[in-house]
Structure formats: structure tokens, C-alpha cells
UniProtKB/Swiss-Prot annotation:
Part of the core atranone cluster (CAC) which products are predicted to catalyze most or all steps of mycotoxin atranone synthesis, starting from geranylgeranyl pyrophosphate (GGPP). The initial cyclization of GGPP to dolabellane is probably performed by the terpene cyclase ATR13. The Baeyer-Villiger oxidation near the end of the atranone synthesis, which converts atranones D and E to atranones F and G is predicted to be catalyzed by the monooxygenase ATR8. Of the CAC's other predicted gene products, the reducing PKS ATR6 might synthesize a polyketide chain. This is Core atranone cluster (CAC) protein 11. InterPro entries: Fungal_Meroterpenoid_Isomerase, NTF2-like_dom_sf. Pathway: Mycotoxin biosynthesis. It comes from the Eukaryota.
Length: 133
């Protein structure tokens, strides 16, 4: 079983490589992804929904960079938290934001829950730029 740190490092690499197969390799069969805050009105997704969201937005981003600022591991709760800066070139200009990812691990080392907090103001502004082009 890979360590939680190694698993999360693999996910960071998969973001930068834009590789959804690598990104979802360590998730469990009962995986749930949640994009927050709730004001975005995005419901929980299973792995198929997560893959669909990734594939639908993948083409917007070029020179994608996911850079970890800090991590926190709670061994007792089988949880890791990641704070990162994200930058990318897009056809509507430079994109830059911060994200917080929370990964919940089961007893086999698989991720069963992934919560992603995004800067909703940046996300909404980016959506408006995409719609206005």
C-alpha cells in the first residue's frame, strides 16, 4: 500500500500532467468528490462525474501548474489536506487561484472522499470570461 503522502504526490503530478487516469487510480469504488463552497451549487460526484468534470474543462487550460504551498497529514483520521496555487494560460487570459484539497483514505489506502475548496470569486470570474468570449 502506498503511503498517503505518495498517493497525494501522484495526484499532484497527475494535475500537472493533465492525466485523469493517473488522478483517479488511487480512488475507491465508493469514491465521492465534492467541489465547494456550497454557493457554487455543485452536488457530490462519483468517479464518473469527477472524470466528466475534468474532461469537460481540461481543454481550457494550457501550461497548467499545480504547486503545493503546504500539506497536513492527520494519521489518526487517515486524512491529508493540501493547499496549492494553481496557474494556467487560457484562451481568455491568465488563470490563477488557490485551492484546498482534503483527501479521506480508507483502510486499504484508497481515497474514498475528496473535497476541493476553490476561490469561488476567481472561479465565477473565469466562467464569466468564458461565457463572454
Amino acid at each position: 500500500m502506498a503511503s498517503r503522502k505518495a498517493t497525494v504526490q501522484s495526484i499532484v503530478e497527475s494535475f500537472n500532467e493533465r492525466d485523469i487516469d493517473k488522478m483517479t487510480a488511487p480512488v475507491s469504488k465508493n469514491f465521492v468528490y465534492q467541489l465547494l463552497p456550497k454557493s457554487l451549487e455543485r452536488g457530490p460526484m462519483d468517479v464518473a462525474g469527477f472524470r466528466g468534470l475534468f474532461e469537460a474543462t481540461k481543454s481550457y487550460f494550457n501550461n497548467f501548474k499545480f504547486e503545493v504551498v503546504d500539506t497536513f497529514e492527520d494519521s489518526a483520521a487517515d486524512k491529508m489536506i493540501l493547499w496549492a496555487n494553481v496557474t494556467s494560460d487560457t484562451h481568455v487570459g491568465k488563470f490563477a487561484t488557490e485551492v484546498m484539497l482534503i483527501f479521506y483514505f480508507d483502510t486499504t489506502g484508497k481515497i474514498y472522499k475528496w473535497i476541493e475548496w476553490i476561490d469561488s470569486a476567481v472561479g465565477k470570474e473565469f466562467e464569466q470570461k468564458l461565457q463572454g468570449q
